[in-house]
Amino acid sequence: MTLKIGKTNQIPAFLAMQVMQDAQRLEATGQDIMHLEVGQPSTPPPDAVNSALSTALGRTASHGYSVALGHPALRQRISAHYQDWYGITPDWNRIAITPGSSLGFAISFLAAFDAGDHIAIATPGYPAYRNLMAALGLVPDLIPARADQAWMPDLEALASSGPLPDGILLASPANPTGVVIADDDLAEICGWCCGMVCG
């Protein structure tokens, strides 16, 4: 019997993880390595966080599965955080807890798009987004972002490059540029999208 290998096996590896693996191999030989490949924290969590985690581990009622979207109390607290910090209160029923942003992106892409859909993303940009899109059968369309435009996506280039994409992925702050999209710029991008789609 031969094991079938899926086509997603041909998706290029996320190079940062390969660099991290190579760096760990060198560390094991005694070499001093400065890790710049992934955004690992350089300091431990605050004592209060470690204490709360330790207490939570002792509560056996919290062990095991939670509801699919995450513990309601946590989702409600996240909604309250948005009210405290940003003055908006998202419906906590629309908040999902994921074990990292990559799974959150995968779930969002699966919910919003179909295989073959085109998603516009800025370049330079975080390479893992392209890998994830390819794994889900989505097609990343690269939008040039340049220093002389404050690394914002060039919407004119997007509009003139062919058929409009089925979606746009915006990251703020962006990796690797660090750009945070200002409210006015985000409103302009949203208005542009609505103008293209809504007529």
Model-identified regions with their sequence ranges:
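N-terminal small-domain helix-loop-helix segment of the aminotransferase-like
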Residues: 9-99, 107
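A short helix-loop-beta submotif of the ANL/AMP-binding
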Residues: 135-141
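Aromatic/hydrophobic pocket-lining residues that form π-stacking "cages" and hydrophobic walls in ligand
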Residues: 19, 23, 129, 189
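Conserved PLP-anchoring active-site segment centered on the Schiff-base-forming lysine
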Residues: 111-133
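Active-site phosphate-binding strand-loop segment of PLP-dependent enzymes
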Residues: 146-199
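Short beta->alpha connector loops at strand-helix junctions that form conserved
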Residues: 123, 142-146
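Helix C-cap/helix->beta junction micro-motif
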Residues: 26-29, 136, 195-196
